[in-house]
């Protein structure tokens, strides 16, 4: 195991080289960007994939089938979290993050090789489902590992700022996926896009995976994990899964509630809305993707500043502001989007994007702080992935089904409002972690 270039201060604090912190944050964020490029591509090309893999005369049925395969990957995420999380607490964060990178890239690359339904029939959607399950299993260890890695490297007083770069990477990945799909949609004919063009973004995952693996293999283990190993003086005893769940049940419930509001709103805006604009509101596909692309670019600009704000005012006030905003502004925002004009759609989507920044900026620092070092990766993986699987990843499928059953185009707003209520209760119950050491770890400061 690689050891970090950090020293112990006389008072017991961990003093880490700022250059090493930036390197760790950059590598984790870049790897996360590559992971979420894959998910972003699937989301933004969902309408085309529905025609390739799920032939039907009903566009809503095609979209529902495509999002069904999308949601299926989230059903195995908790299993991936139960495997990779405890493993990361035992053998190290860096090794597990390298494995998740390989698996995610392989699953995405495989999608680009699958023949269409017209070529092999029912085998096509079955192979798509298999590839999505590989992606979902690997992603079960991704976010918790990356956020844990950054949180354990960052100094206590700047953990919010450094953690915000993880979601900066997520947005960059989404923009890469959305930008590529938008470019192909504009340049290729419908026939070319359906016959071969849709494969290009998935095949790009091959070389991207190699780059991501290189970045993660160069990472060094966190000072907090290294200190845990030193305490054991030998092989670390295996922490029972029961201890990660039953021993942390209060923190797990808080984690699941926070992840619920974070991911329902995240997947609603970044994954579902492009297809909502095209399939349900009959909005021009290219214009819809460009609006979402612009919203994500705006979020990227604001993201680091919002992360730094959480270090000054705390995580709780920022998350609470996001919950209040989604509770009271979701209906006006969706009404604006439904107006259909470019300005109205941009204003509605932009408002939702700025509210989402309250979560993307605060959560990477707030969630790891719920658990002690010994079980942080494992417990966070379990809580995060169970919540994402039940509520976040299923958002496009559930909202599409609700609209189909009721005919009510305001369902996205109602769904976000319900999530905001759950998130508000979690904020009320959680403790403030800004500027404080992570549970089970020594205070962390940055050398100058």
Label for each model-derived stretch:
Residues 43, 249-298, 392-396:
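Extracytoplasmic gate region of multi-pass secondary transporters
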Residues 67-86, 105-107, 293-306:
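Central cavity-lining transmembrane alpha-helices of secondary-active solute carriers
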Residues 161-185, 208, 383-395:
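Glycine-rich segments within core transmembrane alpha-helices of 12-TM secondary carriers
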Residues 90-102, 312-323:
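Cytoplasmic membrane-interface "Motif A"-like loop-to-helix N-cap segments
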Residues 212-219, 418-444:
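Multi-pass alpha-helical transporter architecture, strongest
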Residues 316-363:
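C-terminal transmembrane helical hairpin of 12-TM major facilitator-type secondary transporters
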Residues 46-79, 126:
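Extracellular/periplasmic helix-loop-helix junction of adjacent transmembrane segments
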Residues 102-120, 324-339:
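C-terminal ends and interior cores of transmembrane alpha-helices
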């Amino acid at each position: 195991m690689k050891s970090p270039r950090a020293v112990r201060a006389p008072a017991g604090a961990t003093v880490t080289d700022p250059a090493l912190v930036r390197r760790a944050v950059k590598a984790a964020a870049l790897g996360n960007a590559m992971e979420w490029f894959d998910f972003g591509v699937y989301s933004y090309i969902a309408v085309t994939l529905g025609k390739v893999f799920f032939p039907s005369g009903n566009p809503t049925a095609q979209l529902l089938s495509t999002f069904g395969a999308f949601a299926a990957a989230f059903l195995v995420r908790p299993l991936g979290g139960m495997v990779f999380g405890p493993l990361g607490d035992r053998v190290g964060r860096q090794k597990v993050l390298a494995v998740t990178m390989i698996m995610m890239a392989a699953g995405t690359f495989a999608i680009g090789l699958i023949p269409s339904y017209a070529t092999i029939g029912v085998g096509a959607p079955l192979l798509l489902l298999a590839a999505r399950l590989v992606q979902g299993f690997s992603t079960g260890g991704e976010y918790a590992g990356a956020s844990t890695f950054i949180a354990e490297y960052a100094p206590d007083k700047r953990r919010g700022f450094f953690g915000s770069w993880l979601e900066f990477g997520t947005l960059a990945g989404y923009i890469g996926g959305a930008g590529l799909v938008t470019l192909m949609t504009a340049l290729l004919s419908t026939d070319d896009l359906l016959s071969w063009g849709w494969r290009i973004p998935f095949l790009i995952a091959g070389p991207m995976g190699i780059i991501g693996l290189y970045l993660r293999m160069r990472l060094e283990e966190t000072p907090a994990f290294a200190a845990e190993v030193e305490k054991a003086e030998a092989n670390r005893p295996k922490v029972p899964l029961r201890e990660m769940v039953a021993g942390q049940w209060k923190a797990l419930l808080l984690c699941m509630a926070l992840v619920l509001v974070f991911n329902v709103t995240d997947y609603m805006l970044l994954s579902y809305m492009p297809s909502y604009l095209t399939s349900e509101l009959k909005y021009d596909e290219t214009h819809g993707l460009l609006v979402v692309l612009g919203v994500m670019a705006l979020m990227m600009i604001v993201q680091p500043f919002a992360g730094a704000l959480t270090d000054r005012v705390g995580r709780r006030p920022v998350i609470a502001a996001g919950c209040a905003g989604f509770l009271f502004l979701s209906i006006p925002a969706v009404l604006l989007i439904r107006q259909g004009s470019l300005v109205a759609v941009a204003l509605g989507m932009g408002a939702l994007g700025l509210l989402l920044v309250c979560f993307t900026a605060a959560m990477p620092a707030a969630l790891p702080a719920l658990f002690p070092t010994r079980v942080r990766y494992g417990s966070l993986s379990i809580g995060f992935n169970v919540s994402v699987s039940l509520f976040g990843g299923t958002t496009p499928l559930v909202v599409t089904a609700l609209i189909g059953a009721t005919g009510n185009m305001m369902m996205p707003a109602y769904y976000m409002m319900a999530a905001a209520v759950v998130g508000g209760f979690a904020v009320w119950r959680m403790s403030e972690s800004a500027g404080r050491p992570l549970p089970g770890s020594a205070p962390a400061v940055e050398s100058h």
